[in-house]
Amino acid sequence: MSKIKQVIAREVLDSRGFPTVEADVILTSGVMGRAAVPSGASTGSHEAVELRDGGARYMGKGVLKAVANVNKIAKKITGMEASDIRLIDDTMIALDGTPNKGKFGANAILAVSMAVLRAGAADKKMPLYDYIRKIYAIKEKNYLLPVPMLNIINGGKHADSGLDVQEFMIVPNVSKSFKEGLREATEVYHTLKGILKAKGMVTAVGDEGGFAPHITKHEDVLKTIMDACKKAGHSQIKLALDCAASEFYKNGKYTFEKKQVSSKDMTKVYSSWVKKYPIVSIEDPLHEDDWDGWLHITKELGKKIRLVGDDLFVTNPERLEEGIEKKTANAILIKLNQIGSVSETIDVINMAHKAGYACVISHRSGETEDAFIADLAVATNAGAIKTGAPCRSERNAKYNRLLQIEQELGKKASYAKTKVFKK
């Protein structure tokens, strides 16, 4: 296997126009791997540190410090075998020396981690998903193409729509293939645009490509999406929510539709929606540290739908272990930059699978054209992926990569569909 010859980093722009870190890893064979990391808007307080420069430049969001830190990392990993990804990741983590990557920044470490894997795959002339599976000894016989969870109406921190809930998603979980599922969901998306226009509503899109109409009642959104599914001829499509409830929680209460309510009140709201609408998944329905509330909602809804922990778990093994012990939630959202290295991410996925928790591979609201997570989803047989609406190139880059993978694998792969979501 070739060794690392050179590591180069630079500041590039993400989909929101703010800087992020891109890294190139060049091997002695001459091949190169390149990766750019994403950035979140609504972030869990337990996430690894995304190092920013501060000051006036780019409104304080520059990443020149993180870029400079990649140069420090380069001195330690140059000469290492590209296939020794765990050793490389461990070396970077040890070099940082903090529990949350606060010294070098998760954005610096992750960019290198991803780029090393890309370089290794190129060196072996293997697709990235195959290489990830081999290098981490992932014991899966077949390949699953993930069910896409498409965020078609944005609220919360992703838009100025006035909605508390951050994402309203559609889930084509009974389609014949990924290709067909994406087509059906895309037809619903465009039908929804027509419905909103007919009602005189704005069809501008939010950070993740979903529409951001000024609707104040959440049930009105659910009804409108159901109308779009029916009108598009795809009434079999299911719904999912990302509530990002930590964003509307303060002093033990949730400010929901301009009322102060408790976690039990919120659970009643969600339960009523699950009865009325074909909702198969709710992400972050409660605050990230509201363990009692999470336990209650898991007892109420855990056998009916997916309850996905994002801010609750932040792709962190210690947080996930606590959730497993407390029997809270039944699924975890996987975001590479929450933990800050690919090796640690794989370990969390393995832990979740072993405990019977479902995994959803996810983008961030501040994305790049890098489609690494598409390969990650297929490599790990996660079965589900969240990467926005079928709009904006940084979102479609992931969907297009999955279309390529589905074609490459042919009969070796199947679409996850009802194996993953049941309702």
UniProtKB/Swiss-Prot annotation:
InterPro entries: Enolase (IPR000941), Enolase-like_C_sf (IPR036849), Enolase-like_N (IPR029017), Enolase_C (IPR020810), Enolase_CS (IPR020809), Enolase_N (IPR020811). Binds a second Mg(2+) ion via substrate during catalysis. The lineage of its organism: Bacteria, Pseudomonadati, Elusimicrobiota, Elusimicrobia, Elusimicrobiales. Catalyzes the reversible conversion of 2-phosphoglycerate (2-PG) into phosphoenolpyruvate (PEP). It is essential for the degradation of carbohydrates via glycolysis. Its cofactor is Mg(2+). Belongs to the enolase family. It catalyses: (2R)-2-phosphoglycerate = phosphoenolpyruvate + H2O. PANTHER family: ENOLASE (PTHR11902:SF1). The keyword Transmembrane helix does not apply. Keywords: Cytoplasm, Glycolysis, Lyase, Magnesium, Metal-binding, Secreted. This is Enolase. SMART domains: Enolase_C, Enolase_N. One of its GO terms (molecular function) is magnesium ion binding. It is found in: Cytoplasm; Secreted; Cell surface. Pathway: Carbohydrate degradation; glycolysis; pyruvate from D-glyceraldehyde 3-phosphate: step 4/5. NCBIfam families: eno. GO terms for cellular component: cell surface; extracellular region; phosphopyruvate hydratase complex. (2R)-2-phosphoglycerate binds at residues 166, 335, 364-365, 386. Its EC number is 4.2.1.11. The gene is eno.
